[in-house]
C-alpha cells in the first residue's frame, strides 16, 4: 500500500525465492538471503556492489540450494559459464 506521497507504508513486504519464484512466507525460518559481492576483474577488489539472492526453505530441504545459487550466479555473469 502507498500513501499520498507515494511511499510504501506496509509493515511486511514478502520476499520471493530467486530460484523458484515462490513467495517466502513470514514463518519460513529455513529460508536464507545471501549477498554475493561483485569484484573488479582487474584488481580483484570489492567494487561496492552486490547481488542479493533469496532461497526458500523448500529448495534448501530438497538439497538444491547450491545448484540454484550456481545457476543464478551464472545467469548474472558472476561465475564463468
UniProtKB/Swiss-Prot annotation:
Its cellular-component GO annotations read: cytosolic small ribosomal subunit; rough endoplasmic reticulum
Where found? Answer: Cytoplasm, Cytosol; Cytoplasm; Rough endoplasmic reticulum
Matching Pfam families: Ribosomal_S21e
InterPro entries for the chain = Ribosomal_eS21, Ribosomal_eS21_CS, Ribosomal_eS21_sf
Q: Which UniProt keywords apply?
A: Cytoplasm, Endoplasmic reticulum, Ribonucleoprotein, Ribosomal protein
Query: Any idea which GO molecular function terms this record carries?
Result: structural constituent of ribosome
Annotated GO biological processes are: cytoplasmic translation; endonucleolytic cleavage in ITS1 to separate SSU-rRNA from 5.8S rRNA and LSU-rRNA from tricistronic rRNA transcript (SSU-rRNA, 5.8S rRNA, LSU-rRNA); endonucleolytic cleavage to generate mature 3'-end of SSU-rRNA from (SSU-rRNA, 5.8S rRNA, LSU-rRNA)
- Can you tell which superkingdom this protein's organism belongs to? Eukaryota
Give disulfide pairs as residue numbers: none
Q: Which PANTHER family match?
A: 40S RIBOSOMAL PROTEIN S21
Please state which protein family the record places this protein in. Answer: Belongs to the eukaryotic ribosomal protein eS21 family.
Q: What does this protein do?
A: Component of the small ribosomal subunit. The ribosome is a large ribonucleoprotein complex responsible for the synthesis of proteins in the cell.
| Assembly behavior | Component of the 40S small ribosomal subunit.
Q: How is this protein named in the record? A: Small ribosomal subunit protein eS21
**Gene that this sequence comes from:** rps21
Amino acid at each position: 500500500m502507498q500513501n499520498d506521497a507515494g511511499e510504501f507504508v506496509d509493515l511486511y513486504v514478502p520476499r520471493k525465492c530467486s530460484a523458484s519464484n515462490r513467495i517466502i512466507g513470514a514463518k519460513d525460518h529455513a529460508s536464507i538471503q545471501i549477498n554475493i559481492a561483485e569484484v573488479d576483474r582487474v584488481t580483484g577488489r570489492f567494487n561496492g556492489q552486490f547481488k542479493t539472492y533469496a532461497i526458500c526453505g523448500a529448495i534448501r530441504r530438497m538439497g538444491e540450494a547450491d545448484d540454484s545459487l550456481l545457476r543464478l550466479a551464472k545467469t548474472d555473469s558472476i561465475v564463468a559459464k
